[in-house]
């Protein structure tokens, strides 16, 4: 899309697939950040970091299995409220790129970036700013644009 069409609606979808994990791991001290970390829901692993995967822990393992595989595993119960609060904070952050930001819980932001292309010198530069900002905040996202 070129800058001459900068008033068109152009939706950017940001999916945060690791949000249940990252709402906890961003706050870990460096010594704990390298340990296996799992997120549990009804005593089952629903999310895990690379260290947990490397030890042999897998999605859907029960809590006892995870602890038997690694005694160093750090576990957290899934916290949907914390995830929604984090998604809301990410939406507030995204307002610097567009006044049209929509939350699609549990893990998606929609941003109308059509009117922002000229301000940010085109789609490539805008996406670079958004992606580096998300990375700087400590999150991982997958982006898609509806053209």
Identify the residue ranges that each predicted region occupies.
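Residues that scaffold, gate, or flank divalent-cation-dependent active/transport sites
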Residues: 1-110, 115-117, 122-132, 136, ...
